[in-house]
Regions:
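Cyclic nucleotide-binding regulatory module and flanking cytosolic helices
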Residues: 1-28, 83
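Cyclic nucleotide-binding regulatory domains
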Residues: 36-96
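A small-molecule sensor/coupling module
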Residues: 90, 109-146, 150
């Protein structure tokens, strides 16, 4: 929990009252690899801050194929934000891909913090801006870059995650097959 408080304090001043409120609404959870936090179709009212480990969000198409939208590593947030903000069932599943520790927040109570403690709003606004920019870049990268270029960006964005994530998740995130991922890695090794 202290990681999150320190992260907030490194960017914004935080009153002791706001800090105490965060402690009162947050719950630290230890999770096992394979554990599901959000399941597609469920009502979503939780958001998670990762302090250790790695998680991913994904959807499943009509043919049963998984498409990984996001990996979340230390100091990242993850949830199905579209479901929360539109008050609709989850379109994503969020699962642990390694043993992890997260800080769980009730999304409504997290939103209430802005009303009670306006100094917290810039921190969360920055997080949302980073999330939107990240997704925007991801869409553009999928449309404009080669598989090798996307793979190189993936390695920059998620250093060392390859050691913890199965190849089929990485291929899914990059929008390629596992065979294509093997070819991309072989090309990279030749350079």
């Amino acid at each position: 929990m202290q990681n999150l408080i320190n992260k907030i304090k490194s960017s914004f001043s935080l009153s002791s009252e706001a800090e105490n409120y965060i402690y009162s609404i947050a719950k630290e959870k230890k999770l096992s690899k394979g554990e599901i936090l959000i399941r597609e179709g469920q009502t979503v009212n939780k958001t998670f801050f990762v302090t250790q480990g790695s998680l991913r969000s994904f959807c499943i198409d009509d043919e049963g194929k998984e498409h990984t939208l996001q990996f979340a590593i230390k100091d990242w947030w993850i949830s199905d934000f579209m479901a929360i903000y539109n008050n609709e069932p989850a379109s994503l599943t969020v699962e642990c891909i390694s043993d992890s520790v997260v800080i769980e927040f009730n999304a409504q109570k997290l939103n209430e913090i802005y009303l009670q403690f306006p100094e917290f709003e810039p921190f969360q606004r920055k997080n949302l801006e980073r999330h939107v920019v990240s997704l925007h870049k991801r869409i553009l990268n999928q449309l404009q870059l080669t598989a090798l270029e996307r793979y190189n960006l993936f390695l920059e964005q998620y250093p060392n995650i390859e050691q913890h994530v199965p190849n089929y998740h990485i291929a899914s995130y990059l929008g390629i097959t596992q065979q294509s991922l093997s070819r991309v890695r072989a090309k990279k090794a030749k350079k």
